[in-house]
């Protein structure tokens, strides 16, 4: 039980009990407005307001006590407490708090506040489970038949059966309401299920609900439990879905499904349904009640196990009395038949995933009873390995069982405490490769490739003189001769050697200046924080972001809006914005911090929300760095009571609740008053409607050159070109005669795309064809040379020409012939060297075959190798992996080599850093901090971001990078293959992700790899409320949380192996959960297949086309 603050006079403080079942605010001055109404038939709980004098008074409806009206509302909502307008929360210690202005509080007020916070609060700190359900945002409205009666209230208690109760305490400060004269049918006094007849003459129906396909039967009757009868099935099952994700009981979802869809039993003309057995209920209650206990709740009374029957009653057939786990029929039945496999963890997976060498169950139970052939090693996890992978220093089994009790060659290897042998070069390299960390004992900093602080602490060399004090004694920022003057006002953002966007247009900036000299204010452009009481900010912010662009794609910019809709703290969004876009003092040009009290309240009330889903409060938001509001020498920010709670990224319900904007008009009511699902037509929302699938588009997406409708109707009828003109991809018109002439006339260069192709006739010959003036022309062979064949093959993105033949052409063909002085034209494209002619003197045309460029090969990799769960990768296994680096920051993002001069990465890596001169790309390295003999470095020449990249939804997150020079292709540096356009991966395909990323709180020096399974987009969307999953994205991971995506950095590859050992790039690590988990879902990758045309087009334009000279 924690300490909380009150905003009432001491004389009026009473031992009040929270009225809203399931959750209380930290302040008991106002009962909670965000309580859990899951699975319970209760109405809208009112709130005890505060009178002007500070005493406990009437609720919003004027009713004294705990109900918001004299009559129980039958259409109670799962989100009623969530949806009610939050009462003013306690933050101020004085009435002078105001409008985001700097606050300086006097000692008397502070003493008053300290006195008040010592008063013990009777309410629970927070109902974590309620917040979790709200966090995912799926709590819906629930309807109950209450016979128009009120819930029974006696002795200061609201006796509402079926409620997930919090601890009850006597309320001596408010009169009790009179008992209700009629008792709702769903109270404990209502007839129990044992007394009710299950007979039914209705027809059995098939179970179609996707989640409940795990049931071992396929037909059901109408729900039997009163609570299920009067509640939408989807809403009922949400409660069990989240308990399932918390892993409290492996069959909790099965239990919920058996309640929602009771088994239909046919007995002659009679039909009756089977509810779960009492033992099943007791097992579910035993497993999950402890989770509910964490939030001061208990197993719902409406699901009390005493109402269910024993399977041994009357010594009759148990299968016709109640539904049990039926272990005697095998576990398979619990997952819906022979097509599924039931993991020990309770997860149901496709049977085809069993015994495939992958940890799909998260507990290896799908691999536990698999047989290995005699020539293979059987891992403790059940996996089968080639014996050459045993005792090689790499964890191939996933549990290190292949590396136990090995005979180490002590001249070349180090023996870990568990018997594992690792390479000698891994000793003192900065990574803990031994489980017991014995490989990093008694190591000097230089031996690990690190720099030693004065205190003896080791840090990477790139951390020196970077503006951040990484050494605890600050010695890494001393004697920095090339460092500019210190940042004013304690700013810790002297992170870049050149002025960034925040300094653009400032007279303080020049080519030699630094962020430390940029002290002016800039307008707030971060959408989340556009409704603040101030409109100027100063960077870097308090989370270390150097620009607003960087802040907009940060994890925190997604975290805080998601937390806002949990109602964990009224002023959370205000606090978030004060650290994301700090207020800029126009007089000093310095940041104005939030007050420490605001930070502490935000953290106290919302940190536990993150804890239940395995996340931590952002570590950079240490409240001790912010001043007390009573400080005499520094001002700080506190919010006004009427500060806007909803950010521009939220939709504000009529009730005042904030829901994510992405959930507006999504077909499911998230507002307690359903206002988010009103006026949802495209025209009503001023959007354009696709004719085929009725998809709504912003008008800015119409006729922009990128099809968005499934039938591309948004790009039709966009321009009206003359008969002698052709339409560019961006709907400009150019003269027909200029099409494919080697000079770009369309502003998007589309008049020069795909001009050279190979076409087949009846035989096997491939004829060279040029699409001039919108007509295909054959190329006359007169004067042809091999260098022209090479140019043609390169222009089509192929390898060297293998065959060039002169073949007799046909009568009536359209001909192009070489320009008489083509050798002097210095042309970069084939079409530029050709001119239109009516005939070809020889009558021969060019037949050409080009080789395919070799890609996706790994000559240095050891084959037959699988690594799970994020293990260190062997050198040479991923020769296309590269590191995108900048000075002085070092490694920033991963990248992928796709051609000798071209790499791919994600667009958001360049947010605020789009100058190619500050970047370089490093190839052929496994350990970032140790140079390799295979390493190659190239500077960046050109950065091409996708024009439709949106940082708001991180869509179209891809960029093409041109290198200054070609790489030298070796066994350790080679390009990966690109997929065919629109070649999509099937669900349950296994692929690899690689990168350096982060593991825990440190970045590993060695390249990491892990296997992930492709997850359907519709399933993926269910994990993400803040973002919309589009077909430009791929979802991959494990629902069970096997692979840790913390290890993978942005821009790293997702590659899949084709038959024959060739690897193809299908994804680039873009965004997703901070780490894979049951609650947070998979990682999201840019779908390379969708962008292949665009990628090849950019390479073609940069390589071959030249802009038509003006004038």
From Swiss-Prot:
Regions of this protein lying in the Extracellular compartment: 134-1111
Please name the catalytic residues of this protein.
Answer: 908 (charge relay system), 957 (charge relay system), 1050 (charge relay system)
> Tissue specificity, please?
Specifically expressed in heart. Also detected in kidney, aorta, brain and testis. In kidney, present in epithelial cells, with segmental expression in the proximal tubule, thick ascending limb, connecting tubule, and throughout the collecting duct (at protein level).
Q: Does the keyword section mention Heme?
A: no
Where is the Peptidase S1 domain positioned along the sequence?
Answer: 867-1100
Q: Where is this motif: DDNN motif?
A: 93-96
Please name the top-level EC class of this enzyme: hydrolase
List the SMART domains. FRI (SM00063), LDLa (SM00192), SR (SM00202), Tryp_SPc (SM00020)
Give me the segments passing through the membrane: 113-133
Q: How does the protein associate with the membrane? A: Single-pass type II membrane protein
Q: Which UniProt keywords apply?
A: Cell membrane, Cytoplasmic vesicle, Disulfide bond, Glycoprotein, Hydrolase, Membrane, Protease, Repeat, Secreted, Serine protease, Signal-anchor, Transmembrane, Transmembrane helix, Zymogen
Q: Which GO terms describe its cellular component?
A: cell surface; cytoplasmic vesicle; extracellular region; plasma membrane
What is expression of this protein induced or repressed by? Down-regulated upon experimental heart failure.
What range(s) does the LDL-receptor class A domain occupy?
334-371, 371-407, 407-444, 444-481, 645-681, 681-719, 720-756
The cysteines joined by S-S bonds are 204-264, 212-257, 248-288, 277-322, 281-305, 335-348, 343-361, 355-370, 372-384, 379-397, 391-406, 408-421, 416-434, 428-443, 445-458, 453-471, 465-480, 521-584, 529-577, 568-606, 595-636, 599-623, 646-658, 653-671, 665-680, 682-696, 690-709, 703-718, 721-733, 728-746, 740-755, 855-977, 893-909, 991-1056, 1020-1035
Site Cleavage: which residues? Answer: 866-867
- Name where it's found: Cell membrane; Cytoplasmic vesicle
Q: Which residues form the SRCR domain?
A: 756-851
Q: Which InterPro entries match?
A: Corin, Corin_CRD_1, Corin_CRD_2, Frizzled_dom, Frizzled_dom_sf, LDL_receptor-like_sf, LDLR_class-A_CS, LDrepeatLR_classA_rpt
Q: Where is the FZ domain?
A: 199-325, 516-639
Q: Which family does it belong to?
A: Belongs to the peptidase S1 family.
Q: What is this protein called?
A: Atrial natriuretic peptide-converting enzyme
From which source organism is this entry? Rattus norvegicus (Rat)
Gene name for this UniProt entry: Corin
